[in-house]
């Protein structure tokens, strides 16, 4: 396990990020539904920001988008709110969870539109994986998220071994 209750790591709160983006006609099909690829682009960007904040010195690259659930449609004119946090750290890899909400600015309603789990890897200047700080698990929620992330990581490694 790569977690710590000491000061040599970082808390998930130190690297979390949130952003809001207005969806434009160029982001959508002729019926007004936002393309999934547009959402994936923003998911990858914010996950990369969280991973970079955690890794510090190292460059980070996306290894996989392990889960992307589109739960509700997003439309032109919606404000899309992406909230991202780090759940799990191994030696050089980091699992980032991104929650996607869509706000209808006309009626002020917000729906949970999707969730993504993204794995990023820290690399050095030679493109080789490099160690990142451990996670400081300072509350029960962070401990639970870490354990769930560890379970998902083991599952991903088993799936990769089958390929």
Where are the predicted features?
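Hydrophobic beta-strand-centered segment that forms part of the acyl-chain substrate-binding groove
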Residues: 12-14, 34, 48-94, 111-115
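Residue-level recognition of specific faces of alpha-helices
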Residues: 20, 42, 64-67
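A conserved, well-ordered hydrophobic junction motif at loop->secondary-structure transitions
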Residues: 28-41
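Short amphipathic
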Residues: 12-25
């Amino acid at each position: 396990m790569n977690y710590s209750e000491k000061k040599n790591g970082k808390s998930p709160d130190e690297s979390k990020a949130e952003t809001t983006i207005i969806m434009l006609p160029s982001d959508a099909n002729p019926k007004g539904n936002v393309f999934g690829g547009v959402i994936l682009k923003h998911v990858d960007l914010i996950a990369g920001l969280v991973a970079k904040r955690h890794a510090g010195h190292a460059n980070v690259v996306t290894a996989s988008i392990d889960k992307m659930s589109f739960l509700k449609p997003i439309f032109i004119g919606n404000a899309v709110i992406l909230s991202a946090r780090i759940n799990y750290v191994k030696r050089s890899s980091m699992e980032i969870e991104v929650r996607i909400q869509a706000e209808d600015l006309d009626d002020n309603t917000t729906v949970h539109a999707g969730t993504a789990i993204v794995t990023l890897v820290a690399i050095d200047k030679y493109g080789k994986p490099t160690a990142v700080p451990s996670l400081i698990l300072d509350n029960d929620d962070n401990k639970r998220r870490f354990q769930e992330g560890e379970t998902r990581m083991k599952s991903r490694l088993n799936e990769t071994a089958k390929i």
